[in-house]
């Protein structure tokens, strides 16, 4: 069952060692996928891990590339994305206005960790040509305010 909002006492700025740690505490349940949630209820969390070249992160707005279309061996975008699967969960979040937890892979003390950035909401989405020349879904997220 997805939880929309903060988990336990975790707050923005908290750091997590790896994807397993995120999953175990319920911050982001999938251990590999970048989107947690369902088509019916929406996305409860996303991870920006540097896997998609079209992602953009700023404090006041995140442009999150949809999932799909990447070659699993090279990580490169090789086909157009489609409004299916986890992308439908993000679209549903835009429709419901529910908050999405955002986690971001960051450099920390010579290594990498996942930082909880806080709650965001999906304000819009559209298809656009990505850096590799294929159609990519772009989801815009802004900090969530009640």
Regions found by a protein language model. Name each.
Residues 109-146:
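Compact mixed alphabeta submodule
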Residues 1-115:
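Acidic, glycine-rich low-complexity segments with interspersed aromatic residues
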């Amino acid at each position: 069952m997805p939880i929309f909002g903060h988990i336990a006492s975790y707050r923005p700025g908290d750091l997590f060692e790896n994807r397993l740690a995120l999953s175990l505490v319920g911050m982001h349940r999938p251990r590999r996928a970048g989107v947690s949630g369902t088509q019916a209820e929406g996305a409860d969390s996303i991870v920006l891990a540097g896997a998609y070249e079209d992602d953009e992160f700023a404090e006041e707005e995140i442009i999150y590339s949809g999932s799909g279309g990447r070659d699993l061996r090279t990580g490169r975008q090789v086909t157009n994305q489609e409004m299916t699967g986890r992308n439908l969960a993000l679209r549903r979040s835009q429709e419901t206005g529910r908050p999405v937890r955002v986690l971001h892979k960051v450099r920390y003390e010579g290594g990498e960790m996942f930082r909880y950035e806080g709650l965001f909401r999906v304000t819009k989405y559209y298809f656009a040509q990505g850096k590799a020349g294929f159609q990519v879904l772009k989801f815009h997220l802004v900090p969530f305010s009640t």
